[in-house]
Amino acid sequence: MFSIPPSVRRLVFLFLIAAPLLSIVLPVAAAPAGVDPPSKLQPRAPQPSRRMGATKRSKKIEPLKKKDYSSFLCPGGSVACPIPGDEVSPSSVEALEKSLNSLADWFKVGFECVELETELNSCGGCLALGSGQDCALIENARTTGCENGSCQVYSCFDGYVVSPDRTSCVKRGSTIPATPVTAVNVEEFVADDQLPFGQ
């Protein structure tokens, strides 16, 4: 037969004596005014159960974004631009974009590291990917540069003047020319922090 150790018997005896005394000393908290306490415990209201294997709400699947490999291929501030094999056209740009899916693809095609804010031949974007401009190809421009990602014309060939917005050359007399950058007015540019050629 099973016997209870004396220490456990003493604890049970103390509990049986102490429980009624505690209920007298610590009365049950009164219910808030105007609310009747329930006389019996009430069962929960029935609810439908979930079926096992019920379908979950489908999550929105976002299309995968192409990874930018420039940080792996070029030092800070530079962007990797693919080197085009042929003439750049909308179809060649599309084909090139589809073919550049991994680092290995970039090495197969070939690339150069370009600072798009200042690069004369790829100003503001990669020409092979259909963006940017080659500032050296501006018609009738003698000297050009790339400032803040946009081409700037500094001087034009004879018969042409720099346009007021400094992005092209126009026939002399067809418009008011831009103020030329000379040694006389360089001080104005220095005051405005607008020196050409990064001087």
From Swiss-Prot:
Record key words, sorted: Glycoprotein, Secreted, Signal, Virulence
Residues of this chain annotated as glycosylated in UniProt: N148
Gene Ontology CC entries for this record: extracellular region
Signal sequence region: 1-30
GO BP: any one term: effector-mediated perturbation of host innate immune response by symbiont
InterPro entries linked to this entry: CPL1-like, PriA/CPL1_fungi
Disordered: annotated span: 34-58
Effect of substituting Y160A: Abolishes Il4-independent and Il4-dependent Arg1/arginase-1 expression in mouse bone marrow-derived macrophages (BMDCs)
One Pfam family linked to the record: CPL1-like
Subcellular compartments: Secreted
Lineage: superkingdom: Eukaryota
Upregulation: Induced at 37 degrees Celsius in culture medium for mammalian cells.
Chief place where the protein resides: secreted
Knocked-out gene: effects: Intranasal infection of C57BL/6J mice with knockout fungi severely impairs Arg1 mRNA expression in lung interstitial macrophages, causes a modest reduction in lung eosinophil recruitment while levels of Il4-dependent IgG1 class switching and cytokine production in CD4(+) T-cell are not affected. Causes a decrease in type 2 inflammation and in fungal burden in the lung and the brain resulting in mouse survival. Abolishes Il4-independent and Il4-dependent Arg1 expression in mouse bone marrow-derived macrophages (mBMDCs).
Function: Virulence factor which promotes fungal virulence by enhancing type 2 inflammation in the mouse host. Likely binds mouse Tlr4 independently of Ly96/Md2 and activates Tlr4 signaling to drive Stat3 phosphorylation in interstitial macrophages, which promotes the initial induction of Arg1/arginase-1 and increases macrophage sensitivity to Il4 signaling.
Full protein name: Protein CPL1
Source organism (scientific name): Cryptococcus neoformans var. grubii serotype A (strain H99 / ATCC 208821 / CBS 10515 / FGSC 9487)
Gene label: CPL1
